């Protein structure tokens, strides 16, 4: 038995697991086989616990499949394996273009100073962190929609410049991307108080560069941005069509990556879908780990409301939290804004927070939401998205090109409206409520297994909620 056994396991796990999961949890593992024991080394305790909790059965199952009664015992360790043997992950890439296929520009070491030895060195720049201390991992409400993003961000905070560099988070407005950026910054500085961590919106980078050009201070600009320990840039899509800014950021990106300095970027869309940004930049955005943040599901929306109320020392009855969460679905910011309005109204009037009170306090917001998201609107949007006719969604046709969009539309109707399953079934050609339930479960399963279905669902949610 040899280390090729782990190669076989990796190949199977890569086929069986979603690409993001494999890249995040399995790819960082190192293996050592000796005395009928397969030791798997994880980069930190967090990864070790996650793999042991989530994938232990998968790995043991594969060992039994390949070795039968001779399957080695599995042991987990934190750290790196002895360097006497090297084991490489299969070459085929799962999340982003392999770095070996695109040569990274090499940073040229500064030449010897020679006759310039007596010239004073440039002053150390003063770093403006801009990290909001209020946004931490502790007050970030985790749910199925953001679990992977939070886990990746946590690892980056614990090990900046390590496995996930750059980390690219994308998703709609108000879903928690900015919160995670600040949480990473706070996490890094908690471990290393003197760390040079800089958070900014992409437009600030552009403004700083323009100012540097105007003041003939571009070298100071470069020195500032290329000497940080972690650069956290929000809404990178605003670099679109700003060629000079993209050029400068391209070189900054390369310098930071070569120096093992952490880069985290956020956007409202997948890197390859950002228009107006050079392909060489979009390619680099995907070099590390790319993770989506989706709109929060009902349970997470309720948890967000309850936590926000608790932070404000407000008692929010559970049934009221469910009432709000079932009607406001698009993003966290909308939820928190609605709750702030409810709290303000309660403080002004001295009334208890009940469902009737919330219905009155949020009547315009709730009316607008119900007007925007209807089953008819969902059917129209889904039909346009998949380039089929609404009549196809209502028909008895069962071909996949029609059945899958129909299931998607039913799942969206359950998620975004307050209609019952029988009502949804009636709206789709008089179908039974069990058909709707099957469609919802099927789409939920496919969102776990298929990146394309997951993207379709997120895109449609974003379109319908905007």
Swiss-Prot record:
Residues 1-86 are annotated as: Domain I, interacts with DnaA modulators. Residues 86-129 are annotated as: Domain II. GO terms for cellular component: cytoplasm; plasma membrane. The keyword Cytoplasm applies. The lineage of its organism: Bacteria, Pseudomonadati, Pseudomonadota, Gammaproteobacteria, Enterobacterales. It comes from Salmonella typhimurium (strain LT2 / SGSC1412 / ATCC 700720). Keywords: ATP-binding, Cytoplasm, DNA replication, DNA-binding, Lipid-binding, Nucleotide-binding. SUPFAM superfamilies: P-loop containing nucleoside triphosphate hydrolases, TrpR-like. The gene is dnaA. Residues 347-466 are annotated as: Domain IV, binds dsDNA. Plays an essential role in the initiation and regulation of chromosomal replication. ATP-DnaA binds to the origin of replication (oriC) to initiate formation of the DNA replication initiation complex once per cell cycle. Binds the DnaA box (a 9 base pair repeat at the origin) and separates the double-stranded (ds)DNA. Forms a right-handed helical filament on oriC DNA; dsDNA binds to the exterior of the filament while single-stranded (ss)DNA is stabiized in the filament's interior. InterPro entries: AAA+_ATPase, Chromosome_initiator_DnaA, Chromosome_initiator_DnaA-like, Chromosome_initiator_DnaA_CS, DnaA_C, DnaA_dom, DnaA_N_dom, DnaA_N_sf. This is Chromosomal replication initiator protein DnaA.
């Amino acid at each position: 038995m040899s280390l090729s056994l782990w190669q076989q396991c990796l190949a199977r796990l890569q086929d069986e697991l979603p690409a993001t999961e494999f890249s995040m949890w399995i790819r960082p593992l190192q293996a050592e086989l000796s005395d009928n024991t397969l030791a798997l080394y994880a980069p930190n305790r967090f990864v070790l616990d996650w793999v042991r909790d989530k994938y232990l059965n998968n790995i043991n199952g594969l060992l039994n499949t390949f070795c039968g009664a001779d399957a080695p015992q599995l042991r987990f360790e934190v750290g790196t394996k002895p360097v006497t043997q090297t084991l490489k992950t299969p070459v085929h890439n799962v999340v982003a273009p392999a770095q070996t296929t695109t040569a990274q520009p090499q940073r040229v070491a500064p030449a010897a100073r020679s006759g310039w030895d007596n010239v004073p060195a440039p002053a150390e720049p003063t770093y403006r962190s801009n990290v909001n201390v209020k946004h931490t991992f502790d007050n970030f409400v985790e749910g199925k929609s953001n679990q992977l993003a939070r886990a990746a961000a946590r690892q980056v905070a614990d090990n900046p410049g390590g496995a996930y560099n750059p980390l690219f988070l994308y998703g709609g407005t108000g879903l928690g991307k900015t919160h995670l950026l600040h949480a990473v910054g706070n996490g890094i500085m908690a471990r290393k108080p003197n760390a040079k961590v800089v958070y900014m919106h992409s437009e600030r980078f552009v403004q700083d560069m323009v100012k540097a050009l105007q003041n003939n201070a571009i070298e100071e600009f470069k020195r500032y941005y290329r000497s940080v320990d972690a650069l956290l840039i929000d809404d990178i899509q605003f670099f679109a069509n700003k060629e000079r800014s993209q050029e400068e950021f391209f070189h900054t990106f390369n310098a930071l990556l070569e120096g093992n300095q952490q880069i985290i970027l956020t956007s409202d869309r997948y890197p390859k879908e950002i228009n107006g940004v050079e392909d060489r930049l979009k390619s680099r955005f995907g070099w590390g780990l790319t993770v989506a943040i989706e709109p929060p599901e009902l349970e997470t929306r309720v948890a967000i409301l309850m936590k926000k109320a608790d932070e404000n020392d407000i008692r929010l009855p559970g049934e009221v939290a469910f009432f709000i969460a079932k009607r406001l679905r698009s993003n966290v910011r909308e939820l928190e804004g609605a709750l702030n309005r409810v709290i303000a109204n309660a403080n002004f009037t001295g009334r208890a927070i009940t469902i009737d009170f919330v219905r009155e306090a949020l009547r315009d917001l709730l009316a607008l939401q119900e007007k925007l998201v209807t089953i008819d609107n969902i059917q129209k949007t889904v039909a346009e998205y998949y380039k089929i006719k609404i009549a196809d969604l209502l028909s008895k046709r069962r071909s996949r090109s029609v059945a899958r969009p129909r299931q998607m539309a039913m799942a969206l109707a359950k998620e975004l409206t307050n209609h019952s399953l029988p009502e949804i079934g009636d709206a789709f050609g008089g179908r039974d409520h069990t058909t709707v339930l099957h469609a919802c479960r099927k789409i939920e399963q496919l969102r776990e297994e298929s990146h394309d279905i997951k993207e379709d669902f997120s895109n449609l949610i974003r379109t319908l909620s905007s």
